[in-house]
Amino acid sequence: MMKELPVDRDDAPEPVIQVGLPLTSDALNTLVAAAWPGHSERDWTPILSRSLLWVSAKQQERLVGFVNVAWDGDRHAFLLDTTVHPGVQRRGVGTRLVRAAAVATRAHGVEWVHMDYEPHLEAFYRGCGFAPTRAGLLRLAAPG
């Protein structure tokens, strides 16, 4: 069951960033629903079971940030589902999540990290150390 997280106050403690913290589908669905209107609930168990790692941000026991790292089994990894609760956005939580993911991913011997690029997030990507590149994309599922 999804419930809305309260908007965090300016005097709330800084979120704690952790790699590989056990997470439930309920917690992830609650976070994603707050950050991405129109989100449909999903079972995150099979997704996380195939991940190289994930990084989470918790504030007072509430999940307020998440990034998933998938990989090709060799030198390339992919940041997916980067999400920060609106109540803590624009406070550096997303940057801290991505940087922690990069450090943890490097420890696995990965040489390159890829991320889908959205123009309106360019300042965020650059702040995390990403450079824009041209990439190809083939949609396999029908829109909708």
Language-model segment annotations:
Residues R42-T83:
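A conserved beta-strand-loop-helix scaffold within acyl/acetyltransferase catalytic domains
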Residues V88, G92-A100:
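Conserved acetyl-CoA pyrophosphate-binding loop and the N-cap/start of the following alpha-helix
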Residues H114-A123, L138-P143:
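Conserved beta-strand-loop-alpha-helix junction that forms the acyl-donor binding cleft
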